[in-house]
Amino acid sequence: SLLTNRYEAELELLVFASWHGTEIVSIPIQVYYPPRKERISHFRPGMDFARISLLNTLLCVLAIIYGLPCRLYRKMVTFLRTAYSLLFFLFFMMVIITPLAWLYIKIGRMTEKKQVRLHELIYHAARFVMIHHGIPGTKFIRKVGGMIIKGKEPVRFDFDKPRIIICNHQSHLDLMCQLVFTPKIVFLTNQWVWNNPTYGFLIRHAEYLPVIEGLEPLMPQLRSLTDRGYSIAVYPEGTRSKDCRIGRFHQGAFYLSQELGLEILPMYLYGPGKILPKKTYHLRKGIFYIEVGNPISRKE
């Protein structure tokens, strides 16, 4: 037809995809061009110019009456999703969780039983945010032991045995994804997270440890934690990925495995880096997917 030949059909597809927020990825391919003498031209100046002019005019009109409203609607929905999630998180942390934790910590002395209950509070808070309430526009999917788990289904995996947990790092939301599995987990963080004004108080008293001057100064505390049954979670890349690709691993996690005599439990994350990419501040629609792999022994 007049508007769906060759180049025009591809252009229409790209334009409509961009209006609906579909990510367009460029994939270079090798194309064979025959020698000039062997080429056959199908160019028809009058018909081709008429078709291109008509198509561009139509697309410009549609861009104003259809494409622009679509774009504005998506921006408004993204803003509302981000604003709601941010306000919910601030209210949940600053008005409910942190005051409860502060009272619980300050009343009486800190015992091992109180420490366990503090970790259980963090665990249930993460499950409420990620599973029961959820982040608007997203789904949370877990895969454990080869089984896909959706919603509130129980996880059949032994998380009570202390291990070194490693995971790729994509977003600020990664930690929440991992916390839904067990309360017996402690994270190694950077100084910014440890001093965060929103949840820093909570993670400091939950015995999360900042890696500032290497792992050696932390070894006594890490041994104490694993002796008490806690797993140590590490992001071997050391920083969030900009494009969701897995970066080079540092040796810290493997050093801890050797020194503490623990298995390594790999977890694989996909989605947080698409929903809240590095250096962005708005939440996109998407799927949180986290998979728990098979434990890796020290020999392996």
Predicted ranges, named:
Residues 30-32, 198-200, 227-233, 242-299:
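A cross-family acyltransferase "interaction/gating" segment
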Residues 24, 148-149, 210, 232, ...:
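Hydrophobic beta-strand scaffold residues
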Residues 101-128, 158-214:
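Catalytic core of membrane glycerolipid acyltransferases/transacylases, capturing the structured
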Residues 2-81:
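Hydrophobic helical membrane-anchoring modules
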Residues 16-17, 177-178, 202, 255-259:
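Hydrophobic/aromatic ligand-binding patch that stacks against planar heteroaromatic rings
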Residues 60-69, 225-228, 294-300:
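A charged, well-structured terminal subsegment
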